[in-house]
């Protein structure tokens, strides 16, 4: 029978928030490192909060930094808290990183990245498969 345990993101202490300071993927903040198993996944759920008064971009590098293959992009509205990833699998010690990177959205609108405005909240967690 498959078993899971709920644990905090490895970049968090006791389910506390992680402030996203970097504004470039090359120096992105480590949010989580998956367990080292090649067969047992971590199912990651990430909630993000924009503390600013303007919309801000957020990019997650999911196990790599090749854009668009490994990069997930989001725009968070002013004051918005949103579950941006729900139970997405990752394994084999791959790393999830976050940065508020300036980008142009599909509608042509440009969003400026900013340090210390987005928080990966304590509502984020990992369902770690243990067997």
Regions found by a protein language model. Give the residues of each.
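C-terminal interaction-tip segments
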Residues: 1-38, 98-131
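Asparagine-centered strand-capping/turn motif at beta-strand->loop junctions
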Residues: 33-35, 47-54
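Short beta-strand/loop motifs in extracellular/secreted proteins, especially
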Residues: 42-44, 54-58, 104, 116-118
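Buried hydrophobic-core signal for structured, non-transmembrane domains
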Residues: 44-49, 94-96, 101
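Short, surface-exposed beta-strand/strand-loop-strand elements in extracellular ectodomains
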Residues: 51-71
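Short proline/glycine- and polar residue-rich coil/turn motifs
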Residues: 74-81
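Exposed aromatic-hydrophobic patches
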Residues: 81-88
């Amino acid at each position: 029978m498959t078993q899971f345990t709920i644990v905090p993101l490895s970049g968090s202490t006791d389910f506390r928030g992680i402030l996203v300071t970097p504004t470039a993927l090359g120096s992105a903040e480590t949010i989580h490192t998956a367990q080292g198993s090649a067969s047992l996944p971590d199912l990651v759920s990430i909630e993000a909060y924009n503390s600013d008064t303007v919309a801000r971009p957020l990019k997650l590098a999911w196990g790599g930094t090749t854009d668009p293959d490994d990069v997930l992009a989001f725009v968070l509205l002013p004051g918005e808290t949103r579950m941006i990833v729900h139970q997405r699998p990752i394994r084999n010690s791959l790393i999830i990183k976050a940065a508020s990177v300036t980008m142009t959205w599909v509608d042509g609108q440009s969003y400026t990245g900013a340090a210390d405005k987005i928080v990966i909240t304590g509502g984020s967690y990992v369902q770690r498969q243990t067997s």
